[in-house]
Amino acid sequence: MLSFPKFGHGAVAWVALVPLLSALRALPVLPALLAGLLAGFVQHVGLLYWVTHVVVHYGRLPLALGIPVMMLLALYLSLYTGLFAAGAAFFRNRGIPVVAAAPLLWTVLEYAKSTLLTGFPWENLGHSQYLNLPLIQIADVAGSYGVSFLVVLVNAALAAFVGAGRDGRRRAFVGLAAAGLLLALAGGYGTWRLADVAARFDPVPEQTVALIQGNIDQSIKWDPS
């Protein structure tokens, strides 16, 4: 929540899933599902507060219905977080490391959330990095889902390293190093891409362009009369 507008602290996203992933180490599948539902519900209520204003102001719903509508939407979206947590616990119980399972699970579920039932492609985890221009350049290759994959990979590697015992610390460090390497490669690609685009436009003469945004109230804009 803190990584998105209006807060815009994108760095928080890189550790936001560590508490949930750490808690899953001791949970069977069903309790993990419930933990994911709770975490997702809290997250989406904080992100979707504006839906209440939209359905009340433009949909003409009373506030007593506007708030439950927003909470129902948050509950639906939290199902994907719950499935993520349950899936991570399921694969962990079968010996598949969270560093391998979590990024793939999150990316697949995020794609499903963005496409099923007309889709809800807003507030995806990759969008939290909108201020990190070098990093998000990988979106021209992997889309915003690639950014989400990388964010979850780092979270999973951190959670595995923090929760590893003395015997597993070396393997967890390998996962953390691999995540750091991919992050560095993504940042390096983005830095090169930005420089390449700037070089392409450097010989082009500058031109001044004015753009005026309309300021029409939405309730008037869509009024058929």
List where the protein language model places each region.
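Membrane-embedded alpha-helical bundles of multi-pass enzymes
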Residues: 1-197
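Soluble catalytic regions of membrane-associated enzymes that act on cell-envelope
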Residues: 190-225
